[in-house]
């Protein structure tokens, strides 16, 4: 296919027909062409343009600009090419303003090569010319080209404006580039511009520097909804949900109305902290955007990850439009919350709706099979994903199958599948096998898997802890101590167990061995009372979950202060009986706490939901949604 410039050159040898029109006729012809352009009558305007060209006439730049805008709005690429040829016909040179409009047209048509060729042909370029091209490459994620053009622009002694900087900042992949541009912005006196500050906040957040983003934000005298969204979104994306929510409160106090993008970030923050009450508050703001697909998807995700499946399904069922993200989110949510059969039924509904699954959908389906021990179903979906949906298995799919096989006691098959992976197993894959070894108490294979994980991720404290757990279950205290010594020698610290609970819109954290909570005395008293009552109905501490060689009473005392038990006691103290007690934990719930919560839900007649890094446990009437298969 010929480029636009080669097509233009084909017209240059043509001899222009000398105008046989009178000056009055010329004026009428130009007037008619102008009228048609401003009326956006594209077909008739193109015919009138042919008449102009055949008589060697050209209209003014503003008229052509209107015609080009008409082409852009109608995606009329062919007509746009004809206008470009006309403007360069027989050696004619359009003004810089009009060339910039043409470049913008080709950018809008995603014809960057044609746009750049016109740009290269320009005898002179202004800030609009450069900024249009830089912005185009930045939006198309051709970041290096955008940065190179900025360097050439500066060499050409053209000063960047706020739009140049806001565009090129989003092409920075390293802090050194950002620092350099930030200096240029200050030098040009543009640091107070809202577009520049918004771009700076975005790039700092993208590069994992939210504190720098907050510094830029706090220096602003005034802001707008765009800037607020940038800073809130930045902290939400960097797993700083607490700061994101605090900024959202500041935004509301400042009188700004949250738009879709901001609300999506707020929902992401609530999801990260499992804050159902705050998420519900955000839902109130979303009512006016009830048909916004992205927001509804975020709502479904938030409710699923806060363990409120009724609300998630309500939003899902009320949605008039669903995409693959909607279906995948709901399928994964059901699976993670222990409703595997419902997840697989929803997958069948998804297929019936005509929505094609993607690789994330299949991860959710395999996750459902893994969490319910559906071995035959898991093999079927895994083996058919390529044939039926054209999806090649990736690490996440293999991980689900290894977990499923391991929990089913088929460790040999799990190892065989791991060795047959089409991609290189990573630390997560080996860690999954290690977890299966814990369930099956296979110490030899556990040691092998742990070595693989440590080789790939030597700083991972969780692997050492898991291996130590396996040794402790087998009463191998010398091996437990050896693991601890290795951790000390390498400067690796075990992450302490921490649980969070939301009460009256406030987050309360409980950490094992930490007595800093202002009500810790009352909480401990409540917990001791609960343990005493549970002992009366058959609760016996499972001391094999203690990772220390202690005497019986010491072991029981160690289990007594697990963070989820403290959070549960606090919830029983502070939340009304009709409220579900929702707890988020940073580590996997241990077997003793699992039994404890089942019995507590029956004794206290309460619904308890605990979210750990692996799944959600819904305790009610002495049972758990996981069916003790975890």
Curated annotation (Swiss-Prot):
GO molecular function annotations of the record: RNA binding; zinc ion binding
Keywords: Mitochondrion, Repeat, Transit peptide
GO biological process, one term: RNA modification
Signal peptide extent: none
Transit peptide: 1-76
Gene3D superfamilies hit by this protein: Tetratricopeptide repeat domain
UniProt-annotated location(s): Mitochondrion
GO CC list: mitochondrion
Region of interest: Type E motif: 429-504
Positions of PPR repeats: 60-94, 95-125, 126-160, 161-192, 193-223, 224-258, 259-289, 292-322, 323-357, 358-388, 394-424
Renumbered residue ranges of the record's region Type E(+) motif: 505-535
Pfam families (alphabetical): DYW_deaminase, E_motif, PPR, PPR_1, PPR_2
Segments of this protein annotated with the region Type DYW motif: 536-630
Main location: mitochondrion
Family note: Belongs to the PPR family. PCMP-H subfamily.
NCBIfam families in alphabetical order: PPR
Official protein name in the record: Pentatricopeptide repeat-containing protein At2g03880, mitochondrial
Organism: Arabidopsis thaliana
């Amino acid at each position: 296919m010929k480029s636009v410039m080669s097509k233009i050159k084909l017209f240059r040898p043509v001899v222009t027909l000398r105008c046989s029109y009178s000056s009055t006729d010329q004026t009428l012809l130009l007037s008619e062409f102008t009228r048609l352009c401003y009326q956006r009558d594209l077909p008739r305007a193109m015919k009138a343009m042919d008449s102009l060209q055949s008589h060697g006439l050209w209209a003014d730049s503003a008229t052509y600009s209107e015609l080009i805008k008409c082409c852009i709005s109608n995606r009329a690429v062919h007509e746009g090419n004809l206008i470009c040829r006309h403007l360069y016909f027989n050696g004619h040179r359009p003004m810089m303003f009009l060339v910039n409009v043409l470049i913008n047209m080709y950018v809008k048509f995603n014809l960057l090569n044609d746009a750049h060729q016109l740009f290269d042909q320009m005898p002179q370029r202004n800030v609009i010319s450069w900024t249009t091209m830089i912005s185009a490459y930045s939006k198309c994620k051709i970041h290096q080209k955008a940065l190179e053009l900025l360097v050439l622009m500066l060499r050409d002694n053209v000063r960047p404006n706020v739009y140049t900087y806001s565009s090129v900042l989003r092409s920075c992949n390293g802090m050194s580039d950002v620092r350099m541009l930030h200096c240029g912005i200050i030098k040009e006196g543009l640091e107070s511009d809202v577009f520049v500050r918004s771009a700076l906040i975005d790039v700092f957040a993208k590069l994992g520097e939210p504190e720098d983003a907050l510094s830029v934000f706090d220096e602003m005298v005034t802001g707008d909804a765009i800037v607020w969204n940038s800073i809130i979104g930045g902290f939400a994306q960097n797993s700083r949900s607490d700061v994101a929510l605090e900024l959202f409160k500041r935004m509301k106090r400042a009188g700004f109305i949250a738009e879709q993008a901001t609300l999506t970030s707020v929902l992401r923050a609530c999801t990260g902290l499992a804050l159902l009450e705050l998420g519900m508050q955000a839902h109130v703001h979303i009512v006016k955007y009830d048909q916004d697909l992205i927001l509804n998807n975020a709502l479904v995700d938030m409710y699923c990850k806060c363990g409120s499946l009724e609300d998630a399904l309500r939003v899902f069922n009320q949605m008039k439009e669903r995409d693959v993200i909607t279906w995948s989110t709901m399928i994964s949510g059901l699976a993670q919350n222990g409703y595997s059969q419902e997840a697989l039924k929803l997958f069948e509904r998804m297929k019936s709706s005509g929505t094609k699954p993607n690789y994330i959908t299949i991860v959710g389906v395999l996750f459902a099979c893994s969490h319910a021990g559906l071995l035959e179903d898991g093999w079927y979906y895994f083996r058919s994903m390529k044939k039926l949906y054209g999806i090649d298995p990736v690490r996440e799919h293999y991980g689900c199958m290894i977990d499923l096989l391991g929990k089913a006691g088929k460790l040999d098959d799990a190892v065989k599948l791991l060795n047959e992976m089409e991609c290189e197993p990573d630390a997560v894959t080996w860690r999954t096998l290690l977890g299966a070894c814990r369930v099956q108490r296979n110490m030899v294979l556990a040691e092998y898997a742990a070595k693989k994980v440590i080789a790939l991720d030597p700083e991972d404290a969780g692997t050492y802890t898991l291996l130590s757990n396996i040794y402790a279950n087998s009463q191998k205290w010398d091996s437990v101590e050896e693991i601890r010594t290795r951790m000390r020698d390498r400067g690796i610290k075990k992450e302490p167990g921490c649980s969070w609970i939301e009460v009256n819109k406030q987050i309360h954290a409980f950490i094992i061995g930490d007595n800093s909570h202002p009500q810790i005395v009352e909480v401990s008293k409540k917990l001791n009372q609960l343990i005493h009552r549970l002992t009366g109905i058959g609760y016996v501490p499972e001391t094999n979950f203690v990772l220390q060689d202690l005497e019986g009473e010491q072991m029981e005392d160690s289990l007594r202060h697990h963070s989820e038990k403290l959070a549960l006691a606090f919830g029983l103290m502070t939340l009304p009986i009709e409220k579900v007690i929702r707890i988020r934990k940073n580590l996997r719930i241990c077997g003793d706490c699992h039994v404890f919560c089942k019995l507590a839900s029956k004794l206290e007649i309460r619904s308890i939901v605990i979210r750990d890094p692996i799944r959600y446990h819904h305790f009610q009437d002495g049972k758990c949604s996981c069916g003790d298969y975890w």
